[in-house]
C-alpha cells in the first residue's frame, strides 16, 4: 500500500455505514485510518476498529471524545444524524479539519450551517457518494434540458425499513438537479404526497414517491413521461460499500483543498461534462 496522503476519522464507527467506511479506509491506497468514534457510554469503547469491521486488528481503538484524537486525523467522515453532524462540524472548524458529510435529513438551518462553515474549512457534502448516482445526476440534468418542459417528471425511491427520513437525500438531489436544469426552485414545484381526490396532475411539477421495505440498500428512478413514450433513468445499489468507497475517495481528494463547499460532482470532475 502507498504511503498515506490523508488520515481519516470515522464517526458512528459501530453502525452499518461506519463499519464499511472502516473497511474502505483500510483498503484504499493513500488513506490511513486515524480514528474511529462511537457515542459516549458505548459498550464498544476501547475495542479495535478493524476487529469491529471484520478486517483484523489495526491498533486504532474506538473513542467517544474527538478532543482525544484531534492530532490523529486530517478529515472526518460522518454518516450519522444531523444533530451529531453539526456538533462534529463545529469541532472540525475549530481545529481546521476537513469534513466529508453523508448525513441526510438536514433542515434549511442545518444546510446553511454547513455552507457557512465551508467558508473556513473544506467540506464535501453529498446526498449520495456512489459514482453511479453522481453520473445519474448529470444525466438527469441533460434529460431535463431536452425533455423537462413537456414531460411529466416523477422520482421514485426505495430504501430499507430502518431509514428515518423521506424522501431520501438522493431523491431530493435528483429533484434539485432536474429543477436546476429547468431554472426552477424545487420547493416551488415539488409534490411529496398524493392521497384522496387530487385532481389532475399539475403541469410543471416534480412528483416524489417513497417505499420503505426490508433490506433495500437504495433504488432511485426518475421518469420523464410523455404521451406515447417515457424515459426512465434508474440507479440500484446492492451494497453500501459503493457509498463507503466514494466517501473515502472524497476524503482523499479533500485533503488538497484549503476551504470551500464541494459535492461528489467536484470530486469526480463531472461539472464540466
Swiss-Prot record:
GO molecular function: 4-hydroxy-tetrahydrodipicolinate reductase; NAD binding; NADP binding; oxidoreductase activity, acting on CH or CH2 groups, NAD or NADP as acceptor
Residues the record lists as binding NADP(+): 39
Listed name of the protein: 4-hydroxy-tetrahydrodipicolinate reductase
CDD domains: DHDPR_N (cd02274)
Tree of life domain: Bacteria
EC number, UniProt record: 1.17.1.8
GO terms for cellular component: cytosol
InterPro entries given in the database record: DapB_C (IPR022663), DapB_N (IPR000846), DapB_N_CS (IPR022664), DHDPR_bac (IPR023940), NAD(P)-bd_dom_sf (IPR036291)
Compartments where located: Cytoplasm
Alphabetically ordered keywords of this record: Amino-acid biosynthesis, Cytoplasm, Diaminopimelate biosynthesis, Lysine biosynthesis, NAD, NADP, Oxidoreductase
Similarity comment: Belongs to the DapB family.
Sequence positions that bind (S)-2,3,4,5-tetrahydrodipicolinate: 160, 169-170
Active site: 159 (proton donor/acceptor), 163 (proton donor)
Subunit-level organization: Homotetramer.
Amino-acid positions noted as binding NAD(+) in the UniProt annotation, renumbered to this chain: 12-17, 102-104, 126-129
Function as written in the Swiss-Prot or TrEMBL entry: Catalyzes the conversion of 4-hydroxy-tetrahydrodipicolinate (HTPA) to tetrahydrodipicolinate.
GO biological process: diaminopimelate biosynthetic process; lysine biosynthetic process via diaminopimelate
Listed pathway(s): Amino-acid biosynthesis; L-lysine biosynthesis via DAP pathway; (S)-tetrahydrodipicolinate from L-aspartate: step 4/4
Amino acid at each position: 500500500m502507498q504511503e498515506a496522503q490523508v488520515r481519516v476519522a470515522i464517526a458512528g464507527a459501530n453502525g452499518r455505514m461506519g463499519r464499511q467506511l472502516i473497511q474502505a479506509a483500510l483498503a484504499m491506497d493513500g488513506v490511513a485510518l486515524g480514528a474511529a468514534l462511537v457515542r459516549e457510554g458505548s459498550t464498544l469503547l476501547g475495542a479495535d476498529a478493524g476487529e469491529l469491521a471484520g478486517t483484523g486488528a489495526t491498533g486504532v481503538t474506538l473513542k467517544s471524545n474527538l478532543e482525544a484524537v484531534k492530532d490523529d486525523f486530517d478529515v472526518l467522515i460522518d454518516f450519522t444524524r444531523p444533530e451529531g453532524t453539526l456538533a462534529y462540524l463545529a469541532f472540525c472548524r475549530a481545529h481546521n479539519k476537513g469534513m466529508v458529510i453523508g448525513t441526510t435529513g438536514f433542515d434549511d438551518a442545518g444546510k446553511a450551517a454547513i455552507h457557512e462553515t465551508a467558508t473556513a474549512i473544506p467540506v464535501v457534502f453529498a446526498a449520495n457518494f456512489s459514482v453511479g448516482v453522481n453520473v445519474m445526476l448529470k444525466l438527469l440534468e441533460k434529460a431535463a434540458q431536452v425533455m423537462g418542459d413537456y414531460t411529466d417528471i416523477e422520482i421514485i425511491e426505495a430504501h430499507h425499513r430502518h431509514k428515518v427520513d423521506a424522501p431520501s437525500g438522493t431523491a431530493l438531489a435528483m429533484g434539485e438537479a432536474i429543477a436546476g436544469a429547468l431554472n426552477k426552485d424545487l420547493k416551488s414545484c415539488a409534490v411529496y404526497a398524493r392521497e384522496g381526490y387530487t385532481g389532475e396532475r399539475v403541469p410543471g411539477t416534480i412528483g416524489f414517491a417513497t417505499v420503505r421495505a426490508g433490506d433495500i440498500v437504495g433504488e432511485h428512478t426518475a421518469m420523464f413521461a410523455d404521451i406515447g413514450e417515457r424515459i426512465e433513468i434508474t440507479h440500484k445499489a446492492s451494497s453500501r460499500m459503493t457509498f463507503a468507497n466514494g466517501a473515502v475517495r472524497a476524503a482523499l481528494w479533500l485533503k488538497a483543498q484549503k476551504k470551500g463547499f464541494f459535492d461528489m460532482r467536484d470530486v469526480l470532475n463531472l461539472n464540466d461534462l
